[in-house]
Amino acid sequence: MKLAVFDFDSTLMDGETIDILAHHYGVGEEVDRITKGAMEGGLDFYESLKRRVALLRGMELSLVEEICANLTLMEGAKELIQELKRRDYKVVVFSGGFKNATSKARETLGLDADFSNILHHKEGKLTGEVGGEMMFGSSKGEMMQTLQRLLGISPELTMAVGDGANDASMFPFAKQRVAFCAKPILREKANIIIEKKDLREILAHL
């Protein structure tokens, strides 16, 4: 058994969930600026996440669910996941984004698990607060170590795939470190670099 851990936004999914939600809610430009800073490593991930989610306060939960049910998967996602499963990989998503989106992708792609954050809501509207397992820049690396211990899978048999600064904490615990159409801060830590927006490109490196 092997382990493959994927980032969600701009990796398994083509785009950033919070940016898409923000554009529907009319706060897109403000959120875009914060997201860009976070992914390039210029802003602390925890602070940037809190600031972005706060801008969604008052958004209807039903609209959030509708948007998250219709997010576009990255080119080649289904084919890559199917092949990984065929090769006896446990396939998991770690996301600094939201359960509303990752749980639907888990069902669609047949992932083994999804770890992400929760958008708090009250009376059918977002409160502007967020909590969960992936709140910090170090969260993905910590969760990967926990998962490896639970499953009895070594870093030698682990692949990590991501695109942004908050994916870097996974890389010390994975033999295959895939930077997928990634920011420079992640590319310099990778040993596999994919330039084309097609996850099937990873198949050649398995």
UniProtKB/Swiss-Prot annotation:
Q: Which residues form a coiled coil?
A: none
Record field: transmembrane: none
The UniProt keywords, alphabetically, are:
Amino-acid biosynthesis, Hydrolase, Magnesium, Metal-binding, Serine biosynthesis
Q: Which reaction does it catalyse?
A: O-phospho-L-serine + H2O = L-serine + phosphate; O-phospho-D-serine + H2O = D-serine + phosphate
Q: Which NCBIfam families does the entry mention?
A: HAD-SF-IB, serB
The family assignment reads:
Belongs to the HAD-like hydrolase superfamily. SerB family.
- Name by which UniProt lists this protein: Phosphoserine phosphatase
Specify the species.
Wolinella succinogenes (strain ATCC 29543 / DSM 1740 / CCUG 13145 / JCM 31913 / LMG 7466 / NCTC 11488 / FDC 602W)
